[in-house]
Protein backbone atom coordinates (compact mmCIF):
# COMPACT_ATOMS: atom_id res chain seq x y z
CA UNK A 1 0.00 0.00 0.00
CA UNK A 2 1.32 3.46 -0.86
CA UNK A 3 2.18 5.48 2.21
CA UNK A 4 -0.26 8.40 2.47
CA UNK A 5 0.67 11.94 3.36
CA UNK A 6 0.34 12.88 7.01
CA UNK A 7 -0.04 16.51 7.89
CA UNK A 8 -0.23 18.62 11.00
CA UNK A 9 -0.14 22.33 11.66
CA UNK A 10 3.21 24.00 10.93
CA UNK A 11 5.71 24.04 13.78
CA UNK A 12 5.71 27.09 16.01
CA UNK A 13 8.88 29.19 16.13
CA UNK A 14 11.14 28.38 19.05
CA UNK A 15 9.99 29.97 22.27
CA UNK A 16 6.36 30.26 21.19
CA UNK A 17 3.81 29.02 23.68
CA UNK A 18 1.81 25.90 22.97
CA UNK A 19 -1.94 26.23 22.62
CA UNK A 20 -3.89 25.34 25.77
CA UNK A 21 -5.12 21.78 26.03
CA UNK A 22 -8.67 21.12 24.92
CA UNK A 23 -11.21 20.58 27.66
CA UNK A 24 -12.43 17.00 28.18
CA UNK A 25 -15.20 16.17 25.76
CA UNK A 26 -18.70 15.21 26.83
CA UNK A 27 -20.35 12.22 25.23
CA UNK A 28 -21.25 13.01 21.61
CA UNK A 29 -24.83 13.42 20.48
CA UNK A 30 -26.23 9.98 19.56
CA UNK A 31 -26.84 11.07 15.98
CA UNK A 32 -23.19 12.08 15.53
CA UNK A 33 -21.92 8.83 17.03
CA UNK A 34 -24.25 6.89 14.72
CA UNK A 35 -23.10 8.96 11.76
CA UNK A 36 -19.42 8.39 12.58
CA UNK A 37 -20.06 4.64 12.62
CA UNK A 38 -22.00 4.83 9.35
CA UNK A 39 -19.09 6.66 7.73
CA UNK A 40 -16.68 4.00 8.95
CA UNK A 41 -18.86 1.18 7.64
CA UNK A 42 -19.29 2.81 4.24
CA UNK A 43 -15.61 3.61 3.72
CA UNK A 44 -14.08 0.38 5.01
CA UNK A 45 -15.11 -1.70 1.97
CA UNK A 46 -13.77 1.03 -0.33
CA UNK A 47 -10.31 1.19 1.22
CA UNK A 48 -9.96 -2.37 2.49
CA UNK A 49 -10.11 -2.65 6.27
CA UNK A 50 -8.17 -3.83 8.13
CA UNK A 51 -5.49 -1.61 6.61
CA UNK A 52 -1.90 -2.81 7.11
CA UNK A 53 0.31 -0.59 9.21
CA UNK A 54 2.67 1.30 6.90
CA UNK A 55 5.76 0.79 9.06
CA UNK A 56 6.92 -0.45 12.46
CA UNK A 57 9.22 2.11 14.06
CA UNK A 58 10.10 2.33 17.72
CA UNK A 59 8.23 5.22 19.37
CA UNK A 60 11.19 7.63 19.47
CA UNK A 61 11.84 7.07 15.77
CA UNK A 62 8.13 7.54 15.08
CA UNK A 63 8.31 10.81 16.98
CA UNK A 64 11.11 12.02 14.71
CA UNK A 65 9.24 10.79 11.62
CA UNK A 66 6.07 12.59 12.66
CA UNK A 67 7.89 15.86 13.35
CA UNK A 68 9.51 15.69 9.92
CA UNK A 69 6.18 15.06 8.21
CA UNK A 70 4.41 18.27 9.23
CA UNK A 71 3.11 19.90 6.04
CA UNK A 72 5.53 17.83 3.99
CA UNK A 73 4.95 15.28 1.25
CA UNK A 74 5.45 11.79 2.61
CA UNK A 75 8.12 10.95 0.04
CA UNK A 76 10.15 13.99 1.12
CA UNK A 77 9.81 13.36 4.84
CA UNK A 78 10.65 9.70 4.28
CA UNK A 79 13.86 10.62 2.49
CA UNK A 80 14.77 13.05 5.27
CA UNK A 81 14.18 10.38 7.91
CA UNK A 82 16.42 7.93 6.04
CA UNK A 83 19.07 10.64 5.68
CA UNK A 84 19.07 11.21 9.45
CA UNK A 85 19.33 7.49 10.08
CA UNK A 86 22.24 7.23 7.64
CA UNK A 87 24.14 10.22 9.03
CA UNK A 88 23.74 9.65 12.77
CA UNK A 89 24.37 6.31 14.51
CA UNK A 90 21.66 7.03 17.07
CA UNK A 91 19.33 9.82 18.17
CA UNK A 92 21.79 10.96 20.84
CA UNK A 93 24.25 11.79 18.07
CA UNK A 94 21.54 13.84 16.37
CA UNK A 95 20.97 15.85 19.55
CA UNK A 96 24.69 16.62 19.74
CA UNK A 97 25.07 17.57 16.07
CA UNK A 98 25.41 21.19 14.93
CA UNK A 99 22.02 22.63 13.99
CA UNK A 100 23.14 23.70 10.48
CA UNK A 101 24.30 20.14 9.80
CA UNK A 102 20.94 18.68 10.80
CA UNK A 103 19.15 21.35 8.78
CA UNK A 104 21.18 20.45 5.68
CA UNK A 105 20.46 16.75 6.21
CA UNK A 106 16.69 17.34 6.18
CA UNK A 107 16.74 20.08 3.54
CA UNK A 108 14.04 18.37 1.47
CA UNK A 109 11.27 18.95 4.03
CA UNK A 110 9.31 22.14 4.58
CA UNK A 111 10.79 24.52 7.16
CA UNK A 112 14.05 22.61 7.78
CA UNK A 113 15.37 25.67 9.62
CA UNK A 114 12.57 25.23 12.20
CA UNK A 115 12.38 21.45 12.22
CA UNK A 116 16.10 20.81 12.81
CA UNK A 117 16.29 22.62 16.18
CA UNK A 118 12.75 21.52 17.05
CA UNK A 119 13.59 17.82 16.62
CA UNK A 120 16.78 18.21 18.63
CA UNK A 121 14.92 20.02 21.42
CA UNK A 122 12.12 17.44 21.53
CA UNK A 123 14.58 14.54 21.67
CA UNK A 124 16.58 16.29 24.39
CA UNK A 125 13.37 16.79 26.38
CA UNK A 126 12.48 13.11 26.01
CA UNK A 127 15.93 12.11 27.25
CA UNK A 128 15.71 14.45 30.22
CA UNK A 129 12.19 13.46 31.25
CA UNK A 130 12.45 9.73 30.54
CA UNK A 131 16.06 9.24 31.61
CA UNK A 132 16.98 8.07 28.13
CA UNK A 133 15.86 7.93 24.52
CA UNK A 134 13.32 5.18 25.02
CA UNK A 135 9.55 5.65 25.09
CA UNK A 136 8.63 2.01 25.55
CA UNK A 137 7.31 2.77 29.02
CA UNK A 138 4.32 4.53 27.42
CA UNK A 139 2.89 1.08 26.67
CA UNK A 140 2.13 0.70 30.37
CA UNK A 141 0.11 3.91 30.54
CA UNK A 142 -3.48 4.70 29.65
CA UNK A 143 -3.74 6.31 26.22
CA UNK A 144 -4.74 9.76 27.46
CA UNK A 145 -2.01 9.75 30.10
CA UNK A 146 0.57 8.75 27.49
CA UNK A 147 -0.63 11.49 25.16
CA UNK A 148 -0.48 14.05 27.97
CA UNK A 149 3.09 12.98 28.76
CA UNK A 150 4.13 13.54 25.16
CA UNK A 151 2.20 16.78 24.70
CA UNK A 152 3.87 18.27 27.77
CA UNK A 153 6.97 18.55 25.55
CA UNK A 154 6.99 21.84 23.60
CA UNK A 155 6.59 21.08 19.91
CA UNK A 156 4.52 17.92 20.37
CA UNK A 157 0.84 18.39 19.54
CA UNK A 158 -2.21 16.11 19.44
CA UNK A 159 -1.48 14.67 15.99
CA UNK A 160 2.13 13.86 16.89
CA UNK A 161 1.24 12.27 20.22
CA UNK A 162 -1.45 10.13 18.59
CA UNK A 163 0.90 9.16 15.76
CA UNK A 164 3.59 8.00 18.20
CA UNK A 165 1.12 5.78 20.04
CA UNK A 166 -0.78 4.50 17.00
CA UNK A 167 1.78 4.21 14.21
CA UNK A 168 4.78 2.96 16.20
CA UNK A 169 5.30 -0.57 17.50
CA UNK A 170 3.36 0.50 20.60
CA UNK A 171 0.15 0.02 18.55
CA UNK A 172 -1.96 1.80 21.16
CA UNK A 173 -5.60 2.84 20.52
CA UNK A 174 -5.12 6.53 19.73
CA UNK A 175 -6.83 8.40 16.90
CA UNK A 176 -4.63 10.76 14.86
CA UNK A 177 -6.35 13.44 12.78
CA UNK A 178 -4.51 15.01 9.85
CA UNK A 179 -5.70 17.76 7.52
CA UNK A 180 -7.42 15.34 5.12
CA UNK A 181 -9.20 13.47 7.93
CA UNK A 182 -10.20 16.82 9.43
CA UNK A 183 -11.58 18.18 6.14
CA UNK A 184 -13.76 15.12 5.54
CA UNK A 185 -15.08 15.17 9.12
CA UNK A 186 -15.88 18.86 8.84
CA UNK A 187 -17.75 18.49 5.55
CA UNK A 188 -19.73 15.60 7.01
CA UNK A 189 -20.75 17.76 9.97
CA UNK A 190 -18.97 15.57 12.53
CA UNK A 191 -17.13 18.66 13.76
CA UNK A 192 -18.06 22.32 13.51
CA UNK A 193 -16.73 24.68 10.85
CA UNK A 194 -14.51 26.51 13.35
CA UNK A 195 -13.00 23.45 15.05
CA UNK A 196 -9.31 23.27 14.16
CA UNK A 197 -7.28 20.08 13.68
CA UNK A 198 -5.86 19.96 17.20
CA UNK A 199 -9.13 20.40 19.11
CA UNK A 200 -10.88 17.95 16.75
CA UNK A 201 -8.95 14.99 18.18
CA UNK A 202 -10.98 14.42 21.37
CA UNK A 203 -14.26 15.25 19.62
CA UNK A 204 -13.78 12.69 16.85
CA UNK A 205 -12.42 10.06 19.23
CA UNK A 206 -15.46 10.46 21.50
CA UNK A 207 -17.78 9.71 18.56
CA UNK A 208 -16.27 6.23 18.15
CA UNK A 209 -16.79 3.26 20.49
CA UNK A 210 -14.65 3.47 23.63
CA UNK A 211 -13.67 -0.19 23.30
CA UNK A 212 -12.34 0.02 19.75
CA UNK A 213 -8.95 -1.56 19.25
CA UNK A 214 -5.80 0.13 17.97
CA UNK A 215 -6.48 -1.43 14.56
CA UNK A 216 -10.06 -0.11 14.50
CA UNK A 217 -8.92 3.45 15.23
CA UNK A 218 -6.02 3.20 12.81
CA UNK A 219 -8.46 2.06 10.12
CA UNK A 220 -10.78 4.97 10.90
CA UNK A 221 -7.98 7.49 10.51
CA UNK A 222 -6.65 5.87 7.35
CA UNK A 223 -9.98 5.60 5.53
CA UNK A 224 -10.95 9.20 6.27
CA UNK A 225 -7.49 10.43 5.30
CA UNK A 226 -7.46 8.39 2.09
CA UNK A 227 -10.96 9.58 1.24
CA UNK A 228 -9.78 13.16 1.67
CA UNK A 229 -6.84 12.54 -0.65
CA UNK A 230 -8.71 10.65 -3.36
CA UNK A 231 -12.29 11.96 -3.35
CA UNK A 232 -13.00 14.77 -0.87
CA UNK A 233 -10.32 17.07 -2.26
CA UNK A 234 -9.56 20.47 -0.76
CA UNK A 235 -10.71 22.05 -4.02
CA UNK A 236 -13.33 20.52 -6.32
CA UNK A 237 -14.35 17.49 -4.23
CA UNK A 238 -15.67 14.62 -6.34
CA UNK A 239 -19.09 14.48 -4.67
CA UNK A 240 -20.58 12.62 -7.62
CA UNK A 241 -18.23 9.71 -6.98
CA UNK A 242 -18.51 9.75 -3.18
CA UNK A 243 -20.08 6.84 -1.29
CA UNK A 244 -20.87 9.26 1.54
CA UNK A 245 -22.86 11.71 -0.57
CA UNK A 246 -26.24 10.64 0.80
CA UNK A 247 -25.23 11.40 4.39
CA UNK A 248 -23.03 14.43 3.67
CA UNK A 249 -24.62 17.88 4.00
CA UNK A 250 -21.79 19.42 1.97
CA UNK A 251 -22.53 17.17 -1.02
CA UNK A 252 -26.03 18.62 -1.22
CA UNK A 253 -24.50 22.08 -1.59
CA UNK A 254 -22.05 21.10 -4.33
Give each language-model segment a name.
Residues 1-27:
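Polybasic, lysine-enriched low-complexity intrinsically disordered terminal tails
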Residues 28-254:
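Catalytic cores of DNA base-excision repair glycosylases
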